[in-house]
Amino acid sequence: MNTPVVLITGALTGIGRATAIAFAREGARIVVSGRRDEVGQKLVAELREVGVEAEYWRADVRHEDDVRDLVDKTVTRFGRLDIAVNNAATEGRGGLVTEQTAESYAATFETNVLGVLLSMKHELRVMLPQGSGSIVNVSSAYGSVGAAGASVYVGSKHAVEGMTKSAALEVAGTGVRVNVVAPGATDTGMLTRFTNTDENKAALVSTVPIKRLATPEEIAHVIVFVASANAS
């Protein structure tokens, strides 16, 4: 992989963090984004120790001005944008459909769906004139199945997969690719919050055929491959 410029949202923990480290080990130039400045700066220091150029910029993907500025800063700093990993997400409020509110719906969809849409919009604004680029949206295994008690989160991930498929068709033949990675149960802070108790977490693990959770590093390796020319 030739020193691509990689932008990762939701990069400070879990899959996003592991993906940043995996790209750094490939020699990429990296921009990581999130909403916790101290954590972001520590991650950048770790990436630079690997020997790559890296920057952290704060952005809230729910706000278009933040997303626009994040992409513009990336291009100003590095001159281009080759790969974008849209990983920012929230598990939202669990519970039955009858327990949800307009507010709980909006809180999840603004990050998980609108955030991905705005990110793709501004990433493509740069990539299409370049005639090259690769976008990877991070969904979930719940993007293609149902799950009782998680209707809003599940719905948001179905939306991410639908948007990804549509965007991929829109840019076909331009030199830009849009793909989705849909991890199964992965050992992250989000999963711990989602399952809520050790008993629930153990019950989830029992449904996995290999009887263990995936690691963020395993998912990161998939993202790096899907983003690369080897998957084109």
Placement of each model-derived feature along the sequence:
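Conserved glycine-rich cofactor-binding loop
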Residues: 12-13, 36
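The beta1-alpha1 cofactor-binding region of Rossmann-like NAD(H)/NADP(H)-dependent oxidoreductases
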Residues: 37, 59-70, 102, 217
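Conserved mid-core segment of classical short-chain dehydrogenase/reductases
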Residues: 68, 91-106, 129, 149-152, ...
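Catalytic Tyr-X3-Lys loop
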Residues: 98-117, 132, 136, 160-161, ...
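Active-site helix of classical SDR
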Residues: 120, 156, 164
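Alpha-helical segment proximal to the catalytic Tyr-Lys
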Residues: 125, 169-173, 232
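Residue(s) in the substrate-gating loop at a strand-loop-helix junction
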Residues: 140
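C-terminal substrate-recognition "lid" of short-chain dehydrogenase/reductases
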Residues: 212-232
